[in-house]
Amino acid sequence: MQVILLDKVANLGSLGDQVNVKAGYARNFLVPQGKAVPATKKNVEFFEARRAELEAKLAGVLAAAEARATKINELVSVTIASKAGDEGKLFGSIGTRDIADAVTAAGVEVAKSEVRLPNGVLRTTGDHEVHFQVHSDVFAKLNVIVVPEA
């Protein structure tokens, strides 16, 4: 099925590309999320008329994401208190939701889906480097310090 991409899609293309994808992928993912439209003659003409507007919108979203990434990088570190045993092993773990809530409380709005934990959830006290994927092209790093609760 031929579709016109309205957004950058990983491993597929960027704004304005006409690509051939499986019908189910287009019908169930790309079209409902507003990332593509079927490549009919009418849609091609409509897209060409709105191309500049869509590119400006995409640039605005990218600029906002870069601003948020800069704010995350400026935080340097966030401290999270959790119950822990004598050897620094946590009772439970600290996951993406806990980290997102702590960063949001520190003043930068972050969704839990933007938190990337390459080594899995945090299960020990100490310093941990956490990555954030704010946009498909924009990444940020933050140091999360896990301290035992008193």
UniProtKB/Swiss-Prot annotation:
Domain of life: Bacteria
InterPro entries, sorted: Ribosomal_bL9, Ribosomal_bL9/RNase_H1_N, Ribosomal_bL9_bac/chp, Ribosomal_bL9_C, Ribosomal_bL9_C_sf, Ribosomal_bL9_N, Ribosomal_bL9_N_sf
MF terms (GO), sorted A to Z: rRNA binding; structural constituent of ribosome
Gene Ontology BP annotations: translation
RNA-binding recorded as keyword: yes
Gene3D superfamilies for the chain: Ribosomal protein L9, C-terminal domain, Ribosomal protein L9, N-terminal domain
Record key words, sorted: Ribonucleoprotein, Ribosomal protein, RNA-binding, rRNA-binding
Cellular-component GO terms for this entry: ribonucleoprotein complex; ribosome
Physiological role: Binds to the 23S rRNA.
PANTHER family for the chain: 50S RIBOSOMAL PROTEIN L9
Similarity comment: family membership: Belongs to the bacterial ribosomal protein bL9 family.
Protein name (record): Large ribosomal subunit protein bL9
Organism from which the protein derives: Yersinia enterocolitica serotype O:8 / biotype 1B (strain NCTC 13174 / 8081)
